[in-house]
From Swiss-Prot:
HAMAP family: Rel_fac_3. Coiled coil: none annotated. Belongs to the TRAFAC class translation factor GTPase superfamily. Classic translation factor GTPase family. PrfC subfamily. GO terms for cellular component: cytosol. The gene is prfC. Residues 8-275 form the tr-type G domain. It comes from Lactococcus lactis subsp. cremoris (strain SK11). The lineage of its organism: Bacteria, Bacillati, Bacillota, Bacilli, Lactobacillales. This is Peptide chain release factor 3.
Length: 523
């Protein structure tokens, strides 16, 4: 198979949602249909030890939440599928936002009873700004929920995107009968104990009149709704979908696996192939460019706690990866050999010999890489556009509970900070170690992982919220430190101030008008 044919097979997408909308459950079902797992583990099955495959950390298994992006790959219907299951919790939006830089499409999961929720709205705005196509799966049809027409209206009114249903529910909750699949010309009958059963349309494009469904009042109502939508609603346009202007909407129940395989088949038919990415010079690097290129969107420590390893996740943008190849690490200008490279099923992995544009590979990292790094070969020399960064809003002082375990404490901090979900600062005057995060849960996960993965108990002291501003090295003066600010350095050794509040920052500006305060560090 040629390189072009291989790249055309790739479908790389992220699943986004508000917490508890069923994102991890639908991920499990997709993996099951792809043959990657035999049985979908759900949050409900926690007592049996049958955990979600994509939730691989201990804390995820215990709490039933995803706190890190998982990468999973499988083949289905002639396509190579790369799924990135992202954290839904708002405290981990930084990891999610970076992950969205590595995909070509997004699947938005919505709880039929709750509609569009806060985190869904935030993530959709990121997807929209990037022009990523969005496919919507309205979940939990086996439970009582809101009217389907109201949910479609909400997509347009709250998210500002036109929608087109690809199927339509027949009843809901205890009256859920199935799905009217006008895309494929059939009815998918809901039989939770026996799986699904299809009723094909006749030559007139209708359910045969002899079938009992035609006398079912819920089916009659669904038929009327569907005909109204087909006549007066938006028409399906593949071009508008790929442009991110129209979202195809699918209904189903991930927990009972109903409607999920139909969704997968249709999604793979219309989801885009790998797309180009821009460099800092605005040059578009196409997937078919023969030179290899990719960028690191995530670093994860301890995917195998036995070996204290660290994996850098690379989205391949162009060309082909071959095991043992030398690449240029653009940030340093140095050559790096990619010899120990893996692909994933959550925490499970296997060595990979080849991968192409659109694939996600894991490179073992001994401290060489940073989130946002670009890897290239041949004539490609420029970095890709920078990944989004977030200024922390909450801060904690942290120290080792046992001073005799300072080495494991420092190793844990170094590795977990490198993942990018939590920021490290060191006081210029006292040497105190401070951590910054966008939400409280990040601190809880940090503390938990330090104990589990590095056997290092920590003492964490809240500092409240602070405002971070960087300064230039030549402006650094210890005398500028006061009771209203903390002079510190970040993990890259850049100088900065942690201001108590906006008033303290304005006071500083008035006293030192020539000092430039930067929201992000720039050279």
């Amino acid at each position: 198979m040629t390189l072009q044919e291989e790249i055309k097979k790739r479908r790389t997408f992220a699943i986004i949602s508000h917490p508890d909308a069923g994102k991890t459950t639908i991920t499990e079902q997709l993996l099951k249909f792809g043959g990657a797992i035999r049985e979908a583990g759900t949050v409900k099955a926690r007592k049996t030890g049958n955990f979600a495959k994509s939730d691989w950390m201990d804390i995820e298994k215990e709490r039933g939440i995803s706190v890190t992006s998982s990468v999973m790959q499988f083949d289905y219907a002639g396509k190579r599928v790369n799924i990135l299951d992202t954290p839904g919790h708002e405290d981990f939006s930084e990891d999610t936002y970076r992950t969205l830089m590595a995909v070509d499409a997004a699947v938005m999961v919505i709880d039929s009873a709750k509609g569009i929720e806060a985190q869904t709205k935030k993530l959709f705005q990121v997807v929209k700004r990037r022009g990523i196509p969005v496919f919507t799966f309205i979940n939990k049809l086996d439970r009582d929920g809101r009217e389907p027409l109201d949910l479609l209206s909400e997509l347009e009114e709250i998210l500002g995107i036109a929608s087109v249903p690809m199927n339509w529910p027949i009843g809901m909750g205890k009256n859920f009968q199935g799905l009217y699949d006008f895309t494929h010309g059939r009815v998918e009958v809901y039989q939770p104990e026996d799986g699904k059963r299809f009723v094909e349309f006749d030559e007139n494009g209708e359910v045969p009149t002899s079938h009992p469904l035609t006398k079912n009042p819920f089916f009659t109502q669904a038929l009327e709704d569907a005909e109204l939508l087909l006549d007066a609603g938006n028409q399906f346009s593949e071009d508008e979908v790929v442009a991110g202007q129209l979202t195809p909407v699918f209904f189903g129940s991930a927990l009972t696996s109903f409607g999920v395989e139909t969704f997968l088949e249709t999604f793979l038919e219309y989801a885009p192939e790998p797309h180009s990415h821009k460099t800092v010079d605005e040059e578009e690097i196409e997937p078919l460019n023969p030179d290899f290129s990719g960028f690191i969107f995530k670093i994860q420590a301890n995917m195998d706690p036995r070996h204290r390893d660290r994996i850098a996740f690379v989205r391949i943008v162009s060309g082909e990866f071959e095991r043992g190849m030398d690449v240029n690490l653009v940030r340093t200008g140095k050559k790096v050999k990619l010899s120990n490279v893996t692909q994933f099923m959550a925490e499970s992995r296997e060595n990979v010999e080849n991968a192409v544009a659109g694939d996600i590979i894991g490179v073992y990292d001994t401290g060489t890489y940073q989130v946002g790094d670009t890897l290239t070969t041949g004539k490609l020399k420029k970095s890709f556009e920078p990944l989004p960064t977030f200024t922390p809003e909450l801060f904690m002082r942290v120290q080792a509970k046992n001073v005799m375990k300072q080495k494991s404490f420092q190793k844990g901090i170094d590795q977990l900070v490198q993942e990018g979900a939590i920021q490290l600062y060191k006081s210029y005057t006292t040497g105190d170690i401070m951590l910054g995060a966008v939400g409280q849960l990040q601190f809880e996960v940090f503390k938990d992982r330090m104990e589990r993965e590095y056997n290092s108990e920590t003492i964490m002291t809240p500092m409240g919220s602070k405002t971070v501003r960087w300064i230039k090295e030549e402006d650094l003066d210890e005398k500028m430190s006061s009771s209203r600010n903390i002079l510190a350095r970040d993990r890259f050794d850049h100088p900065l101030f942690l201001f108590e509040n906006e008033f303290a920052m304005r006071w500083f500006k008035d006293k030192y008008p020539d000092i430039e305060l930067m929201e992000q560090f720039s050279v």
